[in-house]
Amino acid sequence: MSSSKVAVVTGGTSGIGKATALALQKAGCTVYELSRRAEGVEGLRHISADVTDEAAVNAAVAQIVAETGHIDLLVNNAGFGISGAIEFTAPEDAKKLFDVNFFGMVNMNRAVVPLMRAAGHGRIVNLSSVAAPVPIPFQAYYSATKAAVNAYTMALANELRPFGVTVCAVMPGDIHTGFTAARKKVAEGDAIYHGRISRSVQRMEHDEETGMDPAKAGAYISAVALRDGNRHPLYAIRFDYKFFTFLAKVLPARFLNWLIYCLYGK
């Protein structure tokens, strides 16, 4: 059994997930990272599990509880991206994106929430994106999954508030990770769209490749995960992305969408 806080991070073998897991370990937590990979990160406790497989998720959570006795923190980070025009993106690809980015999170929370509720405490951090309040053209399905994460997070936070379990979502912006290379690209229709698909994706990839160090993002997410109290349901990383999310709140939808078009749609 573990006397330290036990943290679980999905998608914890690379990128933001790995950085978050290492930051939590540095803060003194016992950290389990879950991913589909057979091997994990040195120094962390690895469980090979696919978050879209409910039985595998339940088995992983049961193993952690058997070994430690409790789960205090859950960071739902597992996810990937798709780019392309909506009309040319196959429905099965969009459904797979929702299965991982949204329902994978749901599977983890369904397994962990009863434990935290019974214990009378716990913290859940769901990884969202600035693309939730600022939906990006030619990344519509990714933006939609993250908007769903935000709505779900706010609802779950209020459901669990009386039980001492706090829930929030963190919305990163452009981070320099393997996420960019792993993105599934649907290039079909670029000529019809007069090259706007490729230009939009190239701009996004440039912003990501020159973006924030994942270690800084992981440190921020770790700090949010370890924060006491039910302060905010949604967090953005870095001032410029906080400014974007502020604009999304105060600007008329028509003007906001025009601004997004100028940045990523032309």
Predicted regions: what they are:
Residues 49-59, 91:
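The beta1-alpha1 cofactor-binding region of Rossmann-like NAD(H)/NADP(H)-dependent oxidoreductases
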Residues 162-231:
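SDR active-site lid
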